[in-house]
Amino acid sequence: MCGIVGGVSKTDLVPMILEGLQRLEYRGYDSAGLAILGADADLLRVRSVGRVAELTAAVVERGLQGQVGIGHTRWATHGGVRECNAHPMISHEQIAVVHNGIIENFHALRAHLEAAGYTFTSETDTEVIAHLVHHYRQTAPDLFAATRRAVGDLRGAYAIAVISSGDPETVCVARMGCPLLLGVADDGHYFASDVAALLPVTRRVLYLEDGDVAMLQRQTLRITDQAGASRQREEHWSQLSAAAVDLGPYRHFMQKEIHEQPRAVADTLEGALNSQLDLTDLWGDGAAAMFRDVDRVLFLASGTSHYATLVGRQWVESIVGIPAQAELGHEYRYRDSIPDPRQLVVTLSQSGETLDTFEALRRAKDLGHTRTLAICNVAESAIPRASALRFLTRAGPEIGVASTKAFTTQLAALYLLALSLAKAPGASERCAAGGSPGRLRQLPGSVQHALNLEPQIQGWAARFASKDHALFLGRGLHYPIALEGALKLKEISYIHAEAYPAGELKHGPLALVDRDMPVVVIAPNDRLLEKLAANMQEVHARGGELYVFADSDSHFNASAGVHVMRLPRHAGLLSPIVHAIPVQLLAYHAALVKGTDVDRPRNLAKSVTVE
């Protein structure tokens, strides 16, 4: 939910920290701050409420320079959005700490520290860490030892970084449940929550695991567990390009990412089409054995990824002919669940760090599930590393808080999963005939066709901007797309929107319909179209204004109070991927008309790494 970055360098580190914070701003943007060790090892701190741009102006005004430093961009969890709660937190003008996560036992730790004479100036759980490190530094031989002792007292999820005026050539970092990686360069060592923040200085990275504590010095890098036993982490070369995280000609990252979807979907499907759905090539070593005799599938996800699994569940049942269920990670982990040794557990997460999903995976494994598969956009993240199999969607970096290309590439991956399960050993007798890879090659073109409707969608969006509420309807495979459309609209335009299966209208939601309630209908030319048309008549008869996304081969025509936009010819089971595009564009352009911050909507962050 927050982003941290910093390191130790032989040159001034302040520009790198500020640029890194800008690249991490999608993780949190309530406030930002940095601390450096100056020329005389003085601990210097600057904090500001608002965006990184405000922090940059304050840093430039003070002329800060230093070769050891830490930075933070915040999404508030403990304490309001005030400068006193912005990181870094300082103890006795000697220790500075930045922190991503939540310390669950901070009330008890705070009471203990207050009894020991420590004074608190913020409402945050992070200040506890700063005082703990200071407390242990009084007897520890160095900052590294003090940090290890301090994190041993913490319960919860965290990625932290610590500097000290008494250890002027050192940064210490620790990870438990939140993403943290190290960067290796000729001129020093660095850390960040996301590899994008390290691209200006290095592509050589190491991913820390839970329980790791690391000491960074200019020429030295040491990783241990909390007890001090040495740990080794493999070095990777990041393939991420700097251009991939730049806006280019686009106004917003969300706009850029919407328009990248034809390529992202094509890249995600490329390996499958080239390998003819070879299980090992597509899903990794052990996939054939893992998929053999699977008798049900459990999907675990949160947010937009959960909506993708609602589609995937239906694909599995239609194509493979076995039961499937889709659960929210934060609900699954706290309820009683009956394990099934032949059940495949599939987790979806764009970042691979979504805490609710990760903990749900842990719960499933604790129950004895060994058949686990992660579908993720970040290869070396926590959820794929904790899974037996992994599939990497090739969406590229997604910076906008509202997910777009990650969603459609997840859908593409789920369709491939259904096809793969249908051809796995022991599956032939139970499979339906509905699934076919034949239309996959045409899918990127259909997505581009949907994008070409953007000028028409802009006209619709102008009508939405003045509305307070909206209703989205769909049936079957397209009800989850209605859910996704409603979520996108409320996320970035702040228009209250709800989604329902169209058949539920008469059971309550129809009471909401009037002339001020726009009703968006996902209306593909499938076997439910006539049923859906009847539901639309119910809305029209009560004065509701209909906005219909139909296929080019459907019979819908525009009339008074009924607006129709035609997508490509019906894409069969792949239709949800195509119909996701216009609801994304509708939300984006409605937000533009309203003047909201599209990439950084209020109260939201991209990577939800706290419970």
From Swiss-Prot:
The gene is glmS. It comes from Acidithiobacillus ferridurans. The active site is at 2 (nucleophile), 606 (for fru-6p isomerization activity). This is Glutamine--fructose-6-phosphate aminotransferase [isomerizing]. One of its GO terms (cellular component) is cytosol. It is found in: Cytoplasm. The lineage of its organism: Bacteria, Pseudomonadati, Pseudomonadota, Acidithiobacillia, Acidithiobacillales. Gene3D superfamilies: Glucose-6-phosphate isomerase like protein, domain 1, Glutamine Phosphoribosylpyrophosphate, subunit 1, domain 1. Keywords: Aminotransferase, Cytoplasm, Glutamine amidotransferase, Repeat, Transferase. It is an enzyme of class 2 (transferase). Homodimer. GO terms for biological process: carbohydrate metabolic process; fructose 6-phosphate metabolic process; protein N-linked glycosylation; UDP-N-acetylglucosamine metabolic process. Residues 2-219 form the Glutamine amidotransferase type-2 domain. Catalyzes the first step in hexosamine metabolism, converting fructose-6P into glucosamine-6P using glutamine as a nitrogen source.
